């Protein structure tokens, strides 16, 4: 019996709570589906991450759970992770031609509005979290949204991390701290990444 209790205690140290929920932004008449990964212990030191998925052609209403391997890992490390479902089935498809800084901007702006609304609502729902060290992470098109958010609302975030975003120019700024993880299969568009100059 004692052995069983110690195994349960050990497992509970690494456990987390996962759930799906939705927010409703009345000003845009928009539902924002979320996947939330909450660490076992939540307190004033618990940092918050909002994760933005890559584009999937509006085919998957659970794109915000596609990266669960990463969001779970971050939650196990003590972060409170909120993964936003950016594209809904009836949203316009992402532009695949033209000047992407223009043709994709409506999609990115919708993503920025989703992120901003989620921050505002969760600050009310979870005021005990550490919102001073807030982090944004995004992959591909979600990375473009992350960089646009960092450009428009730098005062709200501490760090912005993109994984293989290709289109949105990274702001040239000290704050927030910006990071990009790059694969070797696709290059970013000219001017997107900072140079040494």
Summary of predicted features, one role per range:
Residues 117-174:
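Primarily recognizes the serine-hydrolase "nucleophile elbow" in alpha/beta-hydrolase
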């Amino acid at each position: 019996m004692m052995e069983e209790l110690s195994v349960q205690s050990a497992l509970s140290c690494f456990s987390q709570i996962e759930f799906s929920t939705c927010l409703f932004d009345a000003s845009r008449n928009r539902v924002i589906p979320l996947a939330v990964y909450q660490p076992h212990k939540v307190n004033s030191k618990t940092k918050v991450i909002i994760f933005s998925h890559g584009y999937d052609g509006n085919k998957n209403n659970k794109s915000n759970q596609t990266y669960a391997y990463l969001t779970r890992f971050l939650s196990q490390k003590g972060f409170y992770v909120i993964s936003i479902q950016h594209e809904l089935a009836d949203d316009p498809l992402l532009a695949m031609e033209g000047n992407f800084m223009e043709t994709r901007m409506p999609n990115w702006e919708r993503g920025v509005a989703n992120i901003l609304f989620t921050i505002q609502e969760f600050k009310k729902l979870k005021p005990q979290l550490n919102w001073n060290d807030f982090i944004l992470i995004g992959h591909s098109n979600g990375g473009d949204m992350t960089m646009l958010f960092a450009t428009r609302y730098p005062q709200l975030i501490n760090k912005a991390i993109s994984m293989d975003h290709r289109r949105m120019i990274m702001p040239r700024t000290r704050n927030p701290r910006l990071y990009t993880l790059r694969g070797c299969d696709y290059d970013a568009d000219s001017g997107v990444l900072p140079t040494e100059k």
